[in-house]
């Protein structure tokens, strides 16, 4: 049984949430998180405070801040922050609420954040990408992602040199966890993604986890496949999909050097924004890279989006409250133990100060 229990504590600005029934630390014996955790506004408010305000959130690229004085603003759920490169060439981030002049910062002579009473936000970089964290006591991004990044670089060296080629966003009628759950299991691919099944050889499927990351890897099965055409000279022969807690995923697909970033942005208890960014060796995609983009945006993403929204609809059914995890560690392509890992992190975060 779950090892975290709520004790009598002073009331906070949100109601206590009861622990999920029959959720076990061992995946083989566990039920899933309850359906109302995917629909309840109280759970969503708790997630903002206990998950998104305390973990690493993708905000942009290092290239956007390549010169001293360059700045961009962003939002962590509902908290506005800005990131700036100082004259000392160091990246810094701050809450924006107490400073209305961020757009003109680069024009302010000898700009010093302390002169404006700005509260700092932690900022780190990862393979040329910028992340912020509102929690001053959180684990370092480099520490929690070290193993994942090592694996990503093994599949696609010199990731930091890739440049942004295409951005794509899509509003989705599903809780952010519905998106993560779907992306961490692969048994839906046989039915939902026929062209993906032609691109990748699922008999080569591998999955491995660290504390806050998961990686899936598969070999390309056919150069002339129904997804997009490949060349024998392409540098990436084996796909790797990596997930970083809580809501960022990275795709390295068969083909020329590439990186896809998929951020599952929560916008409400039953709504999310899919934020996709695609990186190649040059800003202008080649013909083969464009074919990959077209397939991903016009085929793969719509197929998954239909699943997200159908699952979310089912979670509102009065006939469903919880399910059981499908666990088969000898057949990882059919197993949900990595989904259980994610849901355990959610449970622990929500129950942390109940």
Each predicted region: which residue ranges?
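Rieske [2Fe-2S] iron-sulfur-binding domain
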Residues: 3-5, 64-136, 142-150
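C-terminal catalytic domain of Rieske-type non-heme iron oxygenases
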Residues: 6-10, 84-90, 121-125, 129-354
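Short, flexible segments with low predicted structural confidence
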Residues: 15-23, 102, 149-152, 235-236
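Short Pro/Gly-enriched beta-strand edge/turn motifs at strand-loop
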Residues: 53-66, 101-107, 243-247
């Amino acid at each position: 049984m779950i090892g975290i229990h709520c004790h009598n504590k002073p009331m906070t600005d949100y109601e206590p949430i009861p622990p999920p029934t029959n959720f076990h630390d061992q995946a083989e014996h566990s039920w899933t998180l309850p359906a109302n955790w995917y629909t309840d506004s109280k759970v969503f408010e708790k997630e903002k405070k206990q998950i998104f305000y305390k973990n690493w959130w993708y905000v942009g690229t290092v290239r956007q801040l390549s010169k001293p004085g360059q700045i961009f603003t962003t939002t962590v759920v509902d908290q506005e922050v800005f990131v700036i490169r100082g004259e000392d060439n160091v990246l810094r981030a701050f809450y924006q609420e107490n400073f209305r002049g961020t757009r003109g910062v680069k024009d302010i002579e000898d700009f010093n954040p302390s002169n404006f009473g700005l509260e700092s936000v932690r900022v780190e970089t990862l393979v040329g990408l910028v992340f912020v964290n509102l929690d001053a006591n959180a684990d370092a991004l480099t520490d929690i992602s070290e193993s994942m990044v090592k694996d990503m670089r093994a599949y696609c060296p010199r990731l930091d040199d890739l440049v942004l080629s295409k951005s794509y966003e899509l509003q989705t009628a599903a809780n952010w966890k519905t998106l993560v759950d779907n992306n961490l299991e692969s048994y839906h691919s046989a039915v939902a993604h026929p062209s993906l099944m032609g691109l990748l050889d699922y008999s080569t499927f591998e999955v491995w986890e660290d504390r806050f990351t998961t990686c899936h890897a598969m070999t390309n099965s056919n150069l002339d496949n129904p997804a997009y055409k490949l060349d024998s000279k392409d540098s990436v022969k084996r796909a790797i999909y990596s997930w970083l807690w809580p809501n960022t995923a990275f795709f390295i697909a068969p083909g020329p050097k590439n990186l896809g970033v998929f951020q599952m942005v929560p916008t409400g208890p039953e709504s999310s924004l899919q934020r996709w960014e695609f990186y190649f060796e040059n800003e202008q995609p080649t013909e083969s890279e464009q074919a990959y983009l077209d397939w991903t945006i016009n085929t793969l993403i719509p197929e998954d989006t239909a699943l997200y929204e159908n699952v979310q609809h089912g979670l509102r059914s009065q006939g469903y409250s919880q399910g059981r995890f499908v666990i088969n560690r000898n057949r990882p392509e059919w197993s949900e133990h990595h989904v259980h890992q994610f849901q355990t992190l959610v449970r622990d975060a929500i129950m942390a100060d109940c």
